[in-house]
Amino acid sequence: MLVKLDTLVARYDELNRLKTQRALGLMSRYGQQVFQLLPVMLHFNHPLLPGYVAGDVPHGIWSFTANEAQQAFIQDLCQNANCQNGLTTHDKSIQGLYSMGSTSSIGQCCHSDLDIWVCHVAGLSQERLELLDLKCQQLSKWAEQRGVDLNFFLIPEDKFRQRNDAQMQGESCGSAQHLLLLDEFYRSAMLIAGKRLLWYLVPAEYDDRYDEYVNGLFAHGKLSQDDWLDLGGFDRIPAEEYFGSALWQLYKGIDSPYKAVLKSVLMEAYSHEYPNTRLLSVTSRDWFQHNEGMHYRLDNYCLMLDKVTNYLKSIGDMQRLDLVRRCFYLKVCDGLSHPKEDHSPAWRREQMTQLVAYWGWSPERLHHLDHRQEWKVEDVKVAHAELLEALMQSYRNLIQFARRNNISESINPEDIGILSRKLYAAFESLPGKVQRINLTIAPDLSEPDLSLVQVPHGRLNRAGWYLYKHSLEPADIIGRAPLEYNGYISKLVSWAYFNGLLTPQSRVHLFNQGSDLHIDNLHQFCRDLSGTFPVKYPRATNLALSRPCEIRQLSIFLNLETDPTSHWVGQVIEFDANAADVFSFGRNLECLVGSVDLVYRNSWSEIRTLHFQGDEAVVDALTTILGKMHQDAAAPEMIEVFCYSQHFRSLVRTRFQQLVAECIELRLARDKQQLVKTLALGKEKYGIFFERRGVSVKKLENAIDFYRHISHNKLDHLPLRLDKTHSQHLPGIVDSYASEGLVQFFFDTRDAGTNIYILDEANRVEIYQHFAGNKDELVQGVNRFYTSSHERFSDAGQFSNFNLPPYYEIVQVNGELEVIPYRSQGPLRDGAGQARELGSATG
């Protein structure tokens, strides 16, 4: 036993040395510097060092001794600062530093990020954890200045021996993954400084008695706890984790689609083997315990490829296998058809050459993949559809796996809500929503020429607007397929702009057959759009995603397609200059707003567009804007109004802006019982009625009709459905959260029992009093209903229902009612907040 242990320890150290050598060989010069100095920065907390934070910051890495390069850095630093005593510490809060993910694997390149686990002793206070987190954030900024993407994750040594109640934050997967994350760590971890990882020494036959075996090693003096970190063992992954992991990988697919496809199919392969799943970490450990040196079975990415290849072959899915191979190639390889770069290690190229030869790829396919930097919108649209369908296929299969095995998800309700809404914002295809197609697939989709062609009603093609990436010259456009179609032009221009096709250098052409739009106004609209919205905008925060979405930036474009004033040529227009009403103008009482186009960014970071045309365009646009605002919403950060009228442009713009501001103020007014805004629109009069739970519009034929309507109980159009035995006053704070298009659940446990308030998509409410069941089971049942019974298929056949209901608790704080996100009430739940913990950000 002792001899074998000695052999494994020596093999562990040698393998870690080879991994470190390989990792450094794939890094840039600055990447090498950051990597080698990390232990120094976290071992010491000194004002001379980057990342210094004042206070009782946990630092000090067990058994860390600076190597020659690190010692030279410390000496130079102290000498330059005239620091005579050098750097010292007596703290030993950090058990070890480890990289995970692509580092040292075939998936690493000079641009790969560094994902670092900072494993610390258990029991650190919340205040000290926050200081350590702040120190890590400072070090990430220091690395960013050197062009290195550095992510830290704080891991208490007992993390994987407890129930996972961590919250998602940034790159952290929170409760979405737990033991799956440990599996990924064990198969990819590389020791940077501190204690070795004990799990690699435990034979597979002892996995079911892991703790007993490990305790025996320490008790009999075979190993010292001062040298080895035990994060725990596992002989299987709970099936409950697969659903949360599928959601997490879909989310990661927004930025890293190729890697996400590999990992999603891996989760699918794991579930296919359930309950006798052969984990990749176990495969890697078995090879390590019985063989010497580096091998592809010790490479995280090669292991993944091998596993998913065997799985897809076993189910006969050769189409996805081909996609998986392309994803692997694009994630890993710089391009075999390009000349070898001097700094590129030979082993990566040799291994990829062997794989490509085995796959039987043609030189043409290699050339196409290797020139991804030159891909334009057609290639990107095809790739986007393929990647998204593959991710959705894995997601569907994992849902079916959970249904077959009657499995409840382990991810907590708050995290599942946040993740599902991140996916909803990124992937859900909805009318008017601008879908971003370039998931880091190609660097530049800009086009020198873009043409917008209108087809009127009565033609062979569908009436509306078509976008082409060519000029209107017959030789350029005849026989070409359009890129996109829509019924209104603002959606097409927005799609081209936010996907990077439309730039200030693009030449925009117009072929108009029926609208009042002319080329100068189209060019001005393009400038107005780009001047108002940046192409890239911040990601939605978890806090925003835990609440109903709100309009953040709103641009309103008047008379872009239909301009009533453009038809005044040769007419005498009589009006009172002192009392001109642009909504009921002149002797003919004409509304000078013929069309309204809305482009807005909401708090979930979606870009939405809407188009209104006709006699009621103004009230339709107003009620739509107001319907996007719940009672307690913040007013939009920015509202811009643009007008393209041939006449009275400034007057129309100013008056509409005033009307919008007035209506928003009424919608968000506090303590209102009932407010009404009357509006003359052409020859008609309308009443806009503002209530806590929504806004409604009614055409008013006469004064009697008006007074009848404002005195009528509006519950006829906002019905309140109570339980059959009791009536219940609805807390006002529930009304405040009313937001159309979203089902919301509120749990009220202030009195004996639990009352449940449910707001549906139309802001109707149902109340269930004295609910006696288990809230966690209710939440899981509702989520399962949405993901299973409500499967919807888009035109492309893709599953696309991510807008799961949010769940809230009503609590009383200092005498005031507040709404907080509902979190699982599991037996080991700790109500105290936690410092940022683990992530699954792997390179």
Curated annotation (Swiss-Prot):
GO terms for MF: adenylate cyclase activity; ATP binding
Catalytic activity line of the entry: ATP = 3',5'-cyclic AMP + diphosphate
GO CC, any one term: cytoplasm
Locations listed in the record: Cytoplasm
InterPro entries, sorted: Adenylate_cyclase_1 (IPR000274), Adenylate_cyclase_1_CS (IPR024686), Adenylate_cyclase_1_N (IPR024685)
Segments of this protein annotated with the region Catalytic: 1-537
Biological processes per GO annotation: cAMP biosynthetic process
Regulation: The regulatory domain is involved in the regulation of cyclase activity by the carbon source.
Key words, A-Z: ATP-binding, cAMP biosynthesis, Cytoplasm, Lyase, Nucleotide-binding
Region Regulatory, residue ranges: 543-843
Tree of life domain: Bacteria
EC number: 4.6.1.1
PANTHER family the UniProt entry points to: ADENYLATE CYCLASE
UniProt similarity note: Belongs to the adenylyl cyclase class-1 family.
Protein known as: Adenylate cyclase
Source species of the chain: Aeromonas hydrophila
Gene that encodes the chain: cya
